């Protein structure tokens, strides 16, 4: 994966609120993450939200954050998304973007 000069690797946790379970949200999130070349994970929570972690170049992570806030899967209805624990990382902790059961 080639990175633009100065495109720092970052890690950020996310949680998406709204109608995001039972609408293939995790599958679409995984596909979008892979398309952008990001790594991390996504899972459903007992509270009816979807949460996970994104890692990759800052510009790609920003694109994915916007996607999580505004797009999601076709049948989802996103109320809001929260992002926490953003930090610069020296290397990726994952080799893939996974759906966690």
Swiss-Prot record:
It catalyses: an acyl phosphate + H2O = a carboxylate + phosphate + H(+). Its EC number is 3.6.1.7. Residues 11-101 form the Acylphosphatase-like domain. The active site is at 26, 44. Organ-common type isozyme is found in many different tissues. It is an enzyme of class 3 (hydrolase). The modification N-acetylserine is found at residue 2. Gene3D superfamilies: 3.30.70.100. This is Acylphosphatase-1.
């Amino acid at each position: 994966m080639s990175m633009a000069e100065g495109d720092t690797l970052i890690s950020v946790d996310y949680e998406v609120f709204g109608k995001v379970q039972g609408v293939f949200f995790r599958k679409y999130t995984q596909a979008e993450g892979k398309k952008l070349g990001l790594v991390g994970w996504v899972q459903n929570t007992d509270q009816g939200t979807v949460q996970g972690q994104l890692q990759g170049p800052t510009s790609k992570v920003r694109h994915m954050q916007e996607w999580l806030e505004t797009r999601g899967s076709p049948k989802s209805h996103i109320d809001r998304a929260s992002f926490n624990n953003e930090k610069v990382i020296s290397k990726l902790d994952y080799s893939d973007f996974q759906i966690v059961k």
